[in-house]
Swiss-Prot record:
It comes from Mus musculus (Mouse). Forms a complex, named COMB/coordinator of mitochondrial CYTB biogenesis, composed of UQCC1, UQCC2, UQCC4, UQCC5 and UQCC6; stabilizes nascent cytochrome b/MT-CYB and promotes its membrane insertion. Forms a complex, named COMA, composed of UQCC1, UQCC2 and UQCC4; activates MT-CYB translation. Forms a complex, named COMC, composed of UQCC1, UQCC2; UQCC3 and UQCC4; mediates MT-CYB hemylation and association with the first nuclear-encoded complex III subunit UQCRQ. Complexes COMA and COMB are bound to the mitochondrion inner membrane by UQCC4. This is Ubiquinol-cytochrome c reductase complex assembly factor 4. Residues 1-15 form the signal peptide. Its main location: mitochondrion. Residues 26-58, 112-136 are annotated as: Disordered. Belongs to the UQCC4 family. Residues 98-136 are mitochondrial intermembrane. Residues 112-127 have a biased composition (Acidic residues). Residues 16-80 are mitochondrial matrix. The keyword Membrane applies.
Amino acid sequence: MNSVLCSRAAGAVRALRLVGWASRSLHPPPRGRSPAQPADREEEDDDPNLPIQFSGSKATPIRWTVEHSLGKPQQRPWWKVLPLTLTLVALVVWCYQREESGMDLWLRQVLEEEDEEEPEGPPEELEAPALYGART
């Protein structure tokens, strides 16, 4: 019987919290705590439905600095950046200096055909009868 009363009381407390949550506005009251927030920290710790506050946990640093996010030197070491840079420079130089192959000739032919289909210069404005195929 006692467990039934406890479960009913817990359900009533949850319902009251839900009503408080639904009725509160988006802006907190000007002073003090919100009426929807429990005043007792022990009650807040016991409720498993409430989210864990990061700012109040032991995981939060006392004072945040850039070093927490980017690391102490705030730059990548040269021995990590240099190989990637040299590889990209070598690729660009190779693409520029290599001899043309059959694939390059085919690609140039395909691209030039597309250029020939598009007229150069501004498109001519068509009059309304010519636009619809009427003879003038």
